């Protein structure tokens, strides 16, 4: 939500749209038509003082004005079924799909045209979204491989293979990444140039939802 508005990405085969609702009344504030499908959710970013709502879909990534629904920019770089939401850090948007790979897009300032900086076509997520922070991009896959890339260049920093796959997205607290696998095993590792496992607790049941961190607690939904 932003400035009293709740945003809903309603991408599907027919009657796709992006909607904004007034949080206080529940009334529609605006809506824009879309002609794409996806399984992803929007993210809200501060692009050099201008708030932008960023959506991924089966063909592209789009940036919208969250107050009006105006399309600000559009980059064709995706394909196939897209479940991963975008990630953002330091002026760069990271979007991925199994069919089209991961693209790092410099969205620049308010008048600049977005440009693709680099692509990654190796181990790619099925549903998990990338995590971007402090010059790193964490990319988990459904078959258990986790890659750490340099956010500026796309160079592989490290890669680690786990016994289980990941459908939920990684979350960050300080410099610690929390990533839960499909069988409920939590991998806790440090964000950095080398893989450093800090702990591996489990919840004892399958997990597909992304954990939420509030204060000093982490909330996990199992099956």
Describe each region flagged by the PLM.
Residues 1-223:
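Noncatalytic, solvent-exposed loop/strand surfaces
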């Amino acid at each position: 939500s932003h400035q009293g508005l709740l945003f809903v990405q309603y991408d599907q085969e027919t009657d796709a749209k992006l909607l904004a609702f007034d949080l206080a009344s529940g009334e529609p504030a605006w809506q824009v038509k879309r002609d794409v499908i996806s399984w992803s959710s929007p993210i809200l970013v501060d692009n050099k003082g201008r708030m932008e709502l960023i959506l991924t879909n089966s063909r592209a990534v789009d940036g919208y004005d969250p107050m009006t629904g105006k399309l600000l920019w559009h980059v064709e770089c995706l394909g196939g079924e897209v479940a991963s939401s975008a990630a953002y850090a330091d002026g760069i948007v990271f979007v991925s799909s199994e069919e089209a790979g991961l693209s790092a897009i410099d969205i620049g300032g308010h008048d600049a045209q977005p440009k693709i900086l680099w692509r990654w076509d190796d181990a790619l997520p099925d549903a998990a979204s990338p995590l971007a922070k402090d010059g790193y991009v964490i990319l988990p896959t459904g078959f258990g491989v986790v890659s750490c890339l340099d956010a500026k260049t796309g160079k592989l920093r490290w890669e680690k293979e786990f016994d289980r796959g990941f459908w939920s997205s990684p979350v960050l607290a300080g410099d610690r990444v929390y990533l839960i696998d499909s069988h409920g095993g939590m991998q806790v590792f440090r964000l950095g140039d080398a893989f450093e496992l800090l702990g591996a607790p489990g919840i004892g049941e399958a997990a597909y939802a992304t954990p939420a961190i509030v204060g000093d607690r982490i909330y996990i939904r199992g099956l």
